[in-house]
Swiss-Prot record:
Subcellular location: Cytoplasm
Catalytic activity entry: Endonucleolytic cleavage to 5'-phosphomonoester
Protein's UniProt keywords contain Signal: no
Function per UniProt: Endonuclease that specifically degrades the RNA of RNA-DNA hybrids.
UniProt cofactor note: Manganese or magnesium. Binds 1 divalent metal ion per monomer in the absence of substrate. May bind a second metal ion after substrate binding.
Assigned EC number: 3.1.26.4
Protein's UniProt name: Ribonuclease HIII
CC cofactor: Mn(2+); Mg(2+)
Record GO terms (molecular function): magnesium ion binding; RNA binding; RNA-DNA hybrid ribonuclease activity
Lineage: Bacteria, Bacillati, Bacillota, Bacilli, Lactobacillales
Residue ranges of domain RNase H type-2 in the record: 83-300
Amino acid sequence: MNTLVLKIDAILSKHLKKQLAPYTINSQNTYVAFAAKKNGVTVLLYKSGKLVLQGNGANALAQELNLPVAKTVFEASNNSQDIPIIGSDEVGNGSYFGGIAVVASFVDPKDHSFLKKLGVDDSKKLSDKTIQQIAPLLEKQIPHQSLLLSPKKYNELVGKSKPYNAISIKVALHNQAIFLLLQKGIQPKQIVIDAFTSQSNYEKHLKKEKSHFPNPLTFQEKAESHYLAVAVSSIIARNLFLDNLDQLGQDLGYQLPSGAGSASDKVASQLLAAYGMSSLEYSAKLHFANTHKAQALLTK
């Protein structure tokens, strides 16, 4: 995804607003004087005179609008954290048992010292014990929005002849978490999502959602290793997922494993024997191959 940043004068600003008048969108960012979206490209004109175009067609739109493209700054790979950032991440989508936890967190540069003292890093490198110790501290200190989609609700929404698939449900959750966080008055300079699909695919699914915001998005693979805001979300989401997995296990009287390996097949077959399919509808993601594997184990 391309991000073009320009500095334009009052005359060009007036001309730009006229050109993009039919494509105007609302922006809750008090620093934004004008916002529009055309050809999949978000255009933000700040009161400072800074103009930002973000999207795969940013260069083409800049040329169409006769903007001084030669003076633009390419920021697609810029991961500077010296600005307020919202970062979002999800946990649980690769696990048969348990729901999906999605968290969006707002990290200001003034939070960096606190986070580094805690040892905040990619949650995938941290033990579950460490995550369970750090997460409550982060939840108390860092503005965030957490969402948990239970397995039961997941099974109602995801699958053949249902509203969502495994990708579009994550788009919906990330979008809603960020939207709700912005509704609290948060004003980030950048929003980063740990990339789980292409930008074009994300935007395709996003069209089906009711909640929208004008802020441009940055998609970064392994973003939790590059942005503290995403690392914070990863840790809080992991803790939320683990709590959910533990609670589901307590409800059923079984220890539910994380992941989608043979251990999940075995426990799933035990649950089928004890309670029937309703136990998996309550605790697992039914469209995973583990369901059929568990049924096969049961017949042996």
